[in-house]
Amino acid sequence: MDTELINKYVVLMEKIYSNSTTKYCSELSKLLNDKIDKFSLTASEELNKDFFHLVSKRKIESINNIEKESIIPIYAISKKETYYYEQIFQSLNKFLMDLITWEVLFFNDFFDMGIQQSAIYLNNIYKNSVNTIYDYTQKNLIGKNNDYFAISLMIIINFEQKKLMEKLNLNHLDFYFYEINKLLWPKFDQIYKATSEQIFKVNMKNNKLFTNGIHSVTHKLGEFLSMINLISKQTTNTPMIFAKLKEIQNLFNQFFYELTETMKFNNNNEREEMVTIFFINNIYYLLVKLKDFDAMKEENDPQSFDKILNNKRETYLNILIKKHFDEINKILQRCINKNNQANGVSFLENEVKKLTKNELKTVAQHFNNKYRDILNAVKKDIYSSIKDTENAKITYTKFLSELLNRYASFVDLLRMTKNDDLLMTIVSVQKLMIEINNITKTLNN
């Protein structure tokens, strides 16, 4: 091994790479688009559709372009192109990855060295280049960056690019990726806290903040949470992300309960129904944004979005049953033994004995004559109130199932009171179940 030749090569290449890296950082600075305040989550309390379109585009481009070749400044300048923080970051990392990948392969082959033997020489070659990019990133791409989406995407990019190097069995940049990660997460925490608090600072009496039943806070929070969801999917820091989602859940629930207190209604029944519908629409929207984050479905957490949605749906179903099938509902409420439902529905004998044949006949015949029309009316009611079609379908399907269960209990009550002649004239549970199954099938077409 010609040690003198190797040392001369190391000195020469270190200087070339160091100068090239410094120049590249300088040229990329001219291409940085940092004027995006008007597209931030907190720029306005009203909905900005351009903002949501831009965020979606940036997310897709970042995830799809992890391996994209580095930006060529002279070409970009000629085209008057500019780039977001995460794009500059991806380009710098890729520049460094390509530099080291090529140099490791060439150096080890040309000087006939193994990876361990060449490590000290290679470290001297690219040490200054790595430090230059690290310093530039720390100062310009993280220190001056208050873009929540950019920092989030940079966390993902850094994680994915480290995985690319691991696939090549090259660990030369492990420490660099680790140190960058140590810069990114504290910055994420800082922006996350400021942004999450600011999102909820709106005029609760401003009716312009509603779009098709969804509040602007929900729209913004959806984008905010979808990015957290994306970080959870793409990286391994799920416990920390989950803790932050818990914080958001509490803020969301507190905000919307306070918001509903500012709304005006004609009576308590209207208030209960409209507030319940409001929660179903807004929480479902957020859960769609978090569809890949299974930790949000912890049933034991009373503040979880999934738990609240289930509770609100149950409340809404009870409201609809009470509104459209109140006669059956009242009889069941009187007669069902609420203290003994572990093994199914049981009845209070004393209450059952108070039921008259005429009372049961009137209720049964009314259901028999009107249930199809009522089911259609309920469907229209749900689909006009629940804005998302899939959400409305789920809610209506649950309503049909709940109605079938209650009607089955009512029929059991008729059998218990020996009203066999009445049972012969009304729709059977089996027939109602078949009709409901057919309705459900049409919803999926």
Labelled PLM ranges:
Residues Y24, L41-E298, I382-D421, T425, ...:
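Extended alpha-helical solenoid scaffold regions that build the rod-like backbones
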Residues N7-Y9, E27-S29, F111-M113, N203, ...:
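Short coil/turn segments at secondary-structure boundaries
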Residues M1, L32, E81, N300-Q303:
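Short linear interaction motifs
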Residues Y17-C25, L32, I36, V104, ...:
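Eukaryotic basic, amphipathic alpha-helical target segments in cytosolic regions
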Residues E27-L28, D189-Q198, T262-F265, R313-L332:
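Charged/polar, low-hydrophobicity segments characteristic of intrinsically disordered regions
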Residues E4-K8, L12, I16-K23, S91-F95, ...:
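Acidic, Ser/Thr-rich intrinsically disordered and amphipathic helical segments
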Residues M1-V10, E14-Y17, T21, C25-L28, ...:
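Extended, charged coiled-coil scaffold/tether segments in eukaryotic proteins
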Residues L287, K291-N445:
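Long C-terminal extensions of eukaryotic subunits of large macromolecular complexes
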